């Protein structure tokens, strides 16, 4: 599966 991570 796809994994998305973001920091902001």
Curated annotation (Swiss-Prot):
<comment type="function">
    <text>Mediates visceral muscle contractile activity (myotropic activity).</text>
</comment>
<keyword id="KW-0027">Amidation</keyword>
<keyword id="KW-0527">Neuropeptide</keyword>
<comment type="similarity">
    <text>Belongs to the kinin family.</text>
</comment>
<feature type="modified residue" description="Glycine amide">
    <location>
        <position position="8"/>
    </location>
</feature>
<keyword id="KW-0964">Secreted</keyword>
<dbReference type="GO" id="GO:0005576">
    <property type="term" value="C:extracellular region"/>
</dbReference>
<protein>
    <recommendedName>
        <fullName>Kinin-4</fullName>
    </recommendedName>
</protein>
<dbReference type="GO" id="GO:0007218">
    <property type="term" value="P:neuropeptide signaling pathway"/>
</dbReference>
